[in-house]
Amino acid sequence: MRAQWMLAPLLALLLVATNADVAAQERVIQVTAERFKFTPGVIELKVGVPVVLELTTLDRKHGFQVPDLKIDEVIEPGKITRVRIVPDKAATYDFHCTVFCGSGHEEMAGQIVVSP
């Protein structure tokens, strides 16, 4: 019984260390929306690697939709919209703006390319 009580703190420490490792491995990619384009226009990811997309806009409200990944966000000026994803298969996913932002809006698109 005494050994179990001594083992519990060690297991808790291991759990905390494991969570810290996962957070350290999470990539952060900044995506900027402005006047009919996203930067970067192509986002390259790896299967199984957690990523946080930090979405910002330099001019006005925009949308960021990736239908095949079930992502549909609004990007507000002066705010950061964070989207966490862990790609589970290699594929190319199209994204586009869903908030009409003027003539040229229909060209505001890009791709997420996930490799093995």
Residue ranges and their predicted role:
Residues 18-24:
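Sec/Tat signal peptide C-region and signal peptidase I cleavage site
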Residues 23, 75-116:
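Extracellular/periplasmic metallocenter environments
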Residues 8-17:
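Bacterial N-terminal signal peptides
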Residues 1-9:
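Bacterial N-terminal signal peptides that target proteins for export
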Residues 29-31, 43, 71-73, 83-85, ...:
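Generic detection of short hydrophobic beta-strand segments and adjacent strand-loop junctions
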Residues 33-35, 49, 56-59, 68-70, ...:
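A mature extracytoplasmic/lumenal domain signature
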